[in-house]
Amino acid sequence: MKSFRHFAVRDSVVFLITLLSWQNLGDSSISHGVAGVLAGLCAFLFHEWGHLIGAYISKAVVHPAPSIFSPLLFDLDSQENNRAQFLYVSATGFIATSLFLFVFSFFLPLGLFAGKLAMYIGLGLAALTVFIEFPIAWFVYRGSKIPRVEIFR
């Protein structure tokens, strides 16, 4: 598997900025908005890293995104991977989504605008996972051919 170190550095910086924004949360709506959006971004990135961990564990063939500015980390090679690898990569994304929803539910201050915004963004991301990613994984699980999922290639 190719190196994803530059994405790890990028996402670590985003995470640290997010923590700082929550630690220095002021009374303004802007500071709450920034903190909430950054937490939502971290949730999205956590979901993507969940997929990548699944790819690593299953030894799936993936190709890193061409730019550090890409929100997606990689392309899963639909021609080189088997059904089990595809499903493993899908499942670990679902697990990551469940984990960030758990953390958001139990650890964010949901009484604050920042907490509510982060939760709404997280629920929106989870809905995208349920309505877009889950049906594809389900059809592959039921025996359909792995669809072409590459975006960058």
Outline where the language-model segments fall.
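Small-residue-rich helix-interface/hinge motifs
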Residues: 38-83
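Short helix-capping/hinge motifs at transmembrane helix termini and TM-loop junctions
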Residues: 25-26, 58-59, 108-109
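Sparse, context-dependent recognition of short Cys/His-centered cofactor- or disulfide-binding micro-motifs
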Residues: 29, 47, 119
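Short pre-active-site segment immediately N-terminal to the catalytic Zn-binding motif
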Residues: 24-44
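Generic, low-specificity signal for short hydrophobic/alpha-helical stretches with a mild N-terminal bias
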Residues: 31-35, 73, 113
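Metalloprotease/metallohydrolase-associated module, dominated by Zn2+-dependent proteases
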Residues: 1-22, 74-153
